[in-house]
Structures are given as structure tokens and as C-alpha cells.
Amino acid sequence: MDNSTGTGEGCHVDSRVDHLFPPSLYIFVIGVGLPTNCLALWAAYRQVRQHNELGVYLMNLSIADLLYICTLPLWVDYFLHHDNWIHGPGSCKLFGFIFYSNIYISIAFLCCISVDRYLAVAHPLRFARLRRVKTAVAVSSVVWATELGANSAPLFHDELFRDRYNHTFCFEKFPMERWVAWMNLYRVFVGFLFPWALMLLCYRGILRAVQSSVSTERQEKVKIKRLALSLIAIVLVCFAPYHALLLSRSAVYLGRPWDCGFEERVFSAYHSSLAFTSLNCVADPILYCLVNEGARSDVAKALHNLLRFLASNKPQEMANASLTLETPLTSKRSTTGKSSGAVWAVPPTAQGDQVPLKVLLPPAQ
């Protein structure tokens, strides 16, 4: 992220080269991400009501994505006006703060999901207390407080910068300021690389636990591996290009603060990579809702109930429609012994954490 203050000559960046791709991508994310995240939020809420700690992380992830999507219309307008912010300094600070904070909030909650799944698979009994709803709520509160606090510095600085062509940049300055460069390094290493490395370790632990389980069928192992790998892939594909350019820009500035050549060359690529991070808002609900056949069935039922409600205009039908979401993300067992989706079953044992993993599939309808 860049922050700006006042006016000045700055670097010669061509704002006309990126007025099509970022707004087009943002419009796509609004159209797809808004309904899918609303559906994911509803599904996560129902998991929380079933005392599933994973639903807490998914619910917070959906809330963060929805807040981010609410800022996109103004950024579409910003890019269509060739990087010219016309909505005043207050809105620039607020919407820029939400926009950029979401990157690290999303990464943090994806990391929380990876750690939760690792504990559920590799140590289902030893760390059972860490996988409670109360613990998930406490962890989520820490995530929000930490990430919002770490990204709050721009709220105390001017964020509008007018260049020589009378463009008013919001949350951007070319070249950046020195304190911003150091802050960017913190974001790259602490906000991006550290949680991604932790997710890699969790994935490795999940692979070991699954491979050592002789009772787990091959197809079930593939599903578990696919889920863990999908979490890593979302962070890598959506956020790695942006942070690679952010790191490069910050390092070049700290080495040669007077040199605008690099800024001018990567300007378009940097904006494109920033827009690419918005795909996270589409990938998150797809990861949750479409990770396996059982989840796809639940989504289909929810959409069927919604369409029936809209067609009949009878709210009572929607209220009576039930949706049970027990996907392979879930490690909880139903108190009734029944589930409409697939779960990771962990039978009780007195011999440590070496327990067989088994995916229980719902009976054929």
C-alpha cells in the first residue's frame, strides 16, 4: 500500500494505461462475490449455531469480504476517472483503510482455518480445547484488533496527493514516502509471508497425518489434501503478485529514493496485481461451498429454497427451509450421529492422537 500527503511533482505515471482492467475485475467481483459471500455468511452462521468453531472463522472471513466488496464501487469510479479521487479526503481514508486492511484480515483467517484443520486431523484429542467456539471467537477478536491496528497508521496522515496533471491519488504516492516503505516491508513479511509459511507447515502436518492413517480411503485422502492445498493456493495466487511488487517497490525506494524509473515501469502491473487481490472475495466462498459434492448439494438446496421463496413470495416457506452444512471442513460429530454432509470422523481412543481418519458420506437420497 502507498500513502500520500500534500502535493508535488512526483513520478510521471500514466494513469490512462490501467483504467479498464481493474474496474472490470472489480465489477466482476461485486457481481459474483456479493451473493456468494452472503450465502457463505448464512452457512457459516448455521455452523456456529451448531457449536462448530470453524464456522466462526468462516463467518469472520465472509464479513471481511463483504466489507471489502462495499468499497469497490468507489474504486471502480476512481479508476474510470484515471486514478482521480473525487469523493473527498474523509471517504478516501475510510474506504482505503477498509480496502487494504481486508488483504491481511483475509490472509489471517485463512491461516486460522489451516491451523484449525491441522489440529483436527493431526491432534484431534490433544488440542480439543483449542477447537471450541469460545476459543475461535477470542482468536477472531485478536485477528481483527491486530490487523486493524497494524493498518491504522494511514488514518493519521493525509491520503490525497495531487500530481502535476491535476490527478488526485488516494492512498497512493509515486514515489512513496520512507515511513510507508518500511511499513510495506512489515506487511510483506509479517502480514503475508509469515502466515503463508505457517499454512505450509500445517499442510505438511496434514499430509503426514493422512498418509499415516491406514484406515483412510484413497478418495478421502484426496479430498482432505485438496482442501488444505486450496487454502494455500488462494493466498499464493491472489496475494503473492501484489506483495512481490510491493516488496520490490519498497526495496528500490529505500535504496534509490530519487529514482522514479522503476515506479513508472511497474505502475500498471502494480495496479493490476492490486486488483487481482479482489479475487480472494470470490475464491473464499467457492472454497467453502464447493469443496466437495456434499457442500455442492447443500448450496443447490439453498438456491432452490431461495428461488422457491422468490417465486411464491411466502416468507414462511423460506423460514421453514433447513440447510445443514457439514462439509469436510468440519471436524465436529453430530450429537444425533447423523449428518447431511461429509465429516471427518474421529473415534475416541485412549492411545494418544493416532486415530483413523474417515469421511462419512450421507446416504443416497
UniProtKB/Swiss-Prot annotation:
Residues 1-10, 83-87, 159-174, 253-262 are extracellular. The chain crosses the membrane at residues 11-47, 52-82, 88-123, 132-158, 175-212, 217-252, 263-291. GO terms for molecular function: G protein-coupled receptor activity. The record marks H157, H167, H271 as: Proton sensing. One of its GO terms (cellular component) is plasma membrane. It is a multi-pass membrane protein. SUPFAM superfamilies: Family A G protein-coupled receptor-like (SSF81321). Glycans are attached at N3, N166. PROSITE patterns: G_PROTEIN_RECEP_F1_1, G_PROTEIN_RECEP_F1_2. Activated by a network of residues that connects an extracellular-facing cavity to Glu-147, a conserved charged residue buried in the transmembrane core of the receptor. Protonation likely drives conformational changes in extracellular loop 2 (ECL2), which stabilizes movement of transmembrane 3 (TM3) and a series of rearrangements that connect the extracellular-facing cavity to Glu-147, a residue only conserved in proton-sensing G-protein coupled receptors. Gene3D superfamilies: Rhodopsin 7-helix transmembrane proteins. Detected in neurons of the brain-stem retrotrapezoid nucleus (RTN). Expressed in the kidney cortex, in the outer and inner medulla and in isolated kidney collecting ducts. Residues 159-174 are annotated as: Extracellular loop 2 (ECL2). Disulfide bonds join C11-C260, C92-C170. Changing E53K: Decreased proton-induced G-protein coupled receptor activity. InterPro entries: GPCR_Rhodpsn, GPCR_Rhodpsn_7TM, GPR4_orph. Residues 48-51, 124-131, 213-216, 292-365 are cytoplasmic. GO terms for biological process: adenylate cyclase-activating G protein-coupled receptor signaling pathway; angiogenesis involved in wound healing; cellular response to acidic pH; G protein-coupled receptor signaling pathway; glomerular mesangial cell development; negative regulation of angiogenesis; phospholipase C-activating G protein-coupled receptor signaling pathway; positive regulation of inflammatory response. Keywords: Cell membrane, Disulfide bond, G-protein coupled receptor, Glycoprotein, Membrane, Receptor, Transducer, Transmembrane, Transmembrane helix. It is found in: Cell membrane. It comes from the Eukaryota. Proton-sensing G-protein coupled receptor activated by extracellular pH, which is required to monitor pH changes and generate adaptive reactions. Activated by an optimal pH of 6.8-7.2. Ligand binding causes a conformation change that triggers signaling via guanine nucleotide-binding proteins (G proteins) and modulates the activity of downstream effectors, such as adenylate cyclase. GPR4 is mainly coupled to G(s) G proteins and mediates activation of adenylate cyclase activity. May also couple with G(q) and G(12)/G(13) G proteins. Belongs to the G-protein coupled receptor 1 family. A multitude of proton-sensing residues, which include extracellular histidine residues (His-157, His-167 and His-271) or triad of buried acidic residues (Asp-65, Glu-147 and Asp-284), contribute to activation of the G-protein coupled receptor activity and pH sensitivity. This is G-protein coupled receptor 4. It comes from Mus musculus.
